[in-house]
Curated annotation (Swiss-Prot):
Catalytic reactions on record: a (3R)-hydroxyacyl-[ACP] = a (2E)-enoyl-[ACP] + H2O
UniProt-listed Pfam families: FabA (PF07977)
Source superkingdom: Bacteria
Lineage of origin: Bacteria, Pseudomonadati, Pseudomonadota, Betaproteobacteria, Burkholderiales
Name of the gene this protein is made from: fabZ
NCBIfam families documented for this protein: fabZ, PRK00006.1
UniProt-listed GO biological process terms: fatty acid biosynthetic process; lipid A biosynthetic process
Keyword Lyase: yes
Keyword Lipid biosynthesis among record annotations: yes
Molecular function terms from GO: (3R)-hydroxyacyl-[acyl-carrier-protein] dehydratase activity
Protein name: 3-hydroxyacyl-[acyl-carrier-protein] dehydratase FabZ
Protein task: Involved in unsaturated fatty acids biosynthesis. Catalyzes the dehydration of short chain beta-hydroxyacyl-ACPs and long chain saturated and unsaturated beta-hydroxyacyl-ACPs.
Keywords: Cytoplasm, Lipid A biosynthesis, Lipid biosynthesis, Lipid metabolism, Lyase
């Protein structure tokens, strides 16, 4: 049975709430705060990008740039939070959110230390256990990356 944890009012999560919903931890937790959430519809989240991120050591030492795949991962984590806001997992520590597909990914600008990456994810549809989302990452109001994401939720013991 699904248990709704949200109402239709404007909702935001701090890092403590995020840590109860996502299994990710440092260095791969890529959402710092949920700024807005409308259950069944959309989420707006934030990733503060700092020079202390471990990936900047090698990407690239003279001109640090956040890897595009990690921008997409941040968007997927925001999508997971949108999904879990609709129906909180019965056993959060045993629930995994798998990224199962990506279409039409585009990278439009670099993301550098000091940027605030705004993660906008909109629910598109749910069919046969697959959630589909439209996702856009922005810095200073300009699109940094966009993609269509597909994800599924499984318990750890049922995972492939």
């Amino acid at each position: 049975m699904r248990r709704t944890i949200m109402s239709t009012e404007k909702i935001n999560f701090d890092i403590h709430k995020i840590l109860t919903l996502l299994p990710h931890r440092y260095p791969i937790l890529l959402v710092d705060r949920v700024l807005e959430l409308e259950p069944h519809k959309s989420i707006k989240a934030l990733k503060n990008v700092t020079v202390n991120e471990p990936f900047f050591t090698g990407h690239f030492p003279k001109r640090p740039v956040m890897p595009g795949v990690l921008i997409i991962e941040a968007l997927a984590q925001a999508a997971a939070l949108l999904t879990f806001a609709e129906a909180e997992p019965k056993d959060p520590e045993n629930t995994l959110y798998y990224f199962v597909g990506i279409d039409n990914a585009r990278f439009k600008r670099v993301v550098e230390p000091g940027d605030q990456l705004i993660l906008n994810v909109t629910f598109e549809r749910y069919i046969r256990g697959i959630w589909k989302f439209k996702a856009v990452a922005e810095v200073d109001g300009k699109v940094a990356a966009e993609a269509e994401l597909m994800c599924t939720v499984k318990t750890a013991d049922a995972a492939p």
